Swiss-Prot record:
SMART domains: UDG, UreE_C. GO terms for molecular function: uracil DNA N-glycosylase activity. It comes from Staphylococcus carnosus (strain TM300). The active site is at 59 (proton acceptor). It catalyses: Hydrolyzes single-stranded DNA or mismatched double-stranded DNA and polynucleotides, releasing free uracil. This is Uracil-DNA glycosylase. Belongs to the uracil-DNA glycosylase (UDG) superfamily. UNG family. The keyword Metal-binding does not apply. It is found in: Cytoplasm.
Amino acid sequence: MNWSEVFHDITNRHDFKEMHDFLDKEYSTKTVYPDKENIYQAFDLTPFDKVKVVIIGQDPYHGPKQAHGLAFSVQPEGKFPPSLRNMYKELEDDIGCKRTVSHLQDWAREGVLLLNTVLTVRKGEAASHRNIGWEVFTDEIIKAVSEYRDHVVFILWGKPAQQKERLIDTSKHDVIKSVHPSPLSAYRGFFGSKPYSRANTYLEAHGETPIDWCGEEAQRG
């Protein structure tokens, strides 16, 4: 199974013509993030048969030079968002390495599917592309990973992500849940939750190579 087959199966069962027509108009008349060629970057960087971890986000960042198709990740020249800073703070406390880069492309190449539930957004208008069809598409992606892959770690931060647990076969996958890393909630249970080491412990217990969360640029403790 690969992403092309997954996409083919999804589009056979759901009609996304209205969504694509809407997006064509949006991209031609407004500023939309990410750039069109980066909408599906999460799937380009993480092949289906390499998925080990799924981190579920919500909408892309809606500021300039930020969104590039990976949940929580920011373009190298983009402004560092607070949620990502908190993710890195927890990473340092959990594993002992200090990341300084704003993008998560190395995580994606390691097998971490960084999946937003909505894949596009209008500049400066959070949630502007919700309920146009993306949620149907990404729910099917989650179900496909759950059905056709084994021993994947699903990391669900915040209530919207945790609502996706119903799509996951928890008898053969691990689910790690906490509040969102946003500054509004991080101190209510995200800090100290150790998602990175917990994910690796599960992967190693099932014969998988652990994720290198630190990356080459990180300072390791």
